[in-house]
């Protein structure tokens, strides 16, 4: 998606972490997935870029050049201690955009206190959804049955200043603009005469490939 590629370090290749990493990879993001478990690394190495390393070890961060990444996702669920130490190490390495999975309220509180910017609830936030949010293209993302998704995005540059009707978003891209939220204003349902402004938040619905095309223009 145009001009929005990020380098993302995913720590932990369990079910959640592997889902985040594969989603980001499919979206064209620059991903490296890391786990200390060699079997997990081998299992995923043919699908996504991987490395075997223990991120609680500062030296391991240096070996994979962790400081070069824009964003990190701490997807460690089997050890609160390892999760917190890893998040702290990544912050110390200069990665300010940290997404960290929590397994309890207490875990979430600790992660927040050390500076993790986004806390992920392990029970309610599916890995695929988090992958889309981490990519930076979506403000929110809900996957529906039947291959349809509802997403919240900022207005793409190619439709700024156009009404929904004039932009022909449904005819050109197959998506539906459900509504628009302008800064300081109430949410408005997506009537055809509404103008899409630069800082508006759009709620749109469509299949993933249709949404991707709309974002790219």
Which ranges hold each PLM region?
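Cytosolic regulatory regions of ion transport systems
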Residues: 1-217
């Amino acid at each position: 998606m145009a001009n929005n590629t990020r380098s993302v370090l995913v720590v932990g290749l369990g079910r959640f972490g592997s889902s985040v990493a594969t989603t980001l990879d499919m979206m064209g993001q620059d991903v490296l997935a890391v786990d200390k478990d060699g079997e997990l690394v081998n299992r995923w190495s043919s699908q996504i870029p991987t490395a075997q390393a223990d991120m609680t070890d500062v030296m391991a961060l240096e070996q994979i050049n962790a400081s070069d990444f824009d964003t990190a996702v701490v997807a460690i669920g089997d050890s609160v201690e390892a999760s917190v130490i890893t998040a702290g190490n990544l912050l110390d390495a200069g990665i300010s955009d940290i997404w960290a999975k929590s397994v309890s309220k207490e875990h979430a509180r600790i992660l927040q206190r050390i500076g993790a910017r986004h806390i992920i609830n392990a029970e309610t936030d599916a890995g695929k959804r988090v992958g889309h949010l981490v990519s930076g293209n979506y403000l929110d993302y809900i996957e529906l049955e039947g291959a349809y998704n509802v997403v919240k995005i900022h207005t793409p540059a190619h439709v700024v200043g156009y009404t929904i009707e004039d932009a022909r978003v449904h005819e050109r891209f197959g998506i539906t603009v459900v509504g628009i939220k302008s800064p300081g204003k109430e949410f408005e349902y997506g009537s055809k005469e509404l103008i899409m402004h630069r800082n508006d938040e759009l709620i749109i619905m469509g299949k993933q490939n249709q949404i991707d095309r709309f974002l790219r223009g």
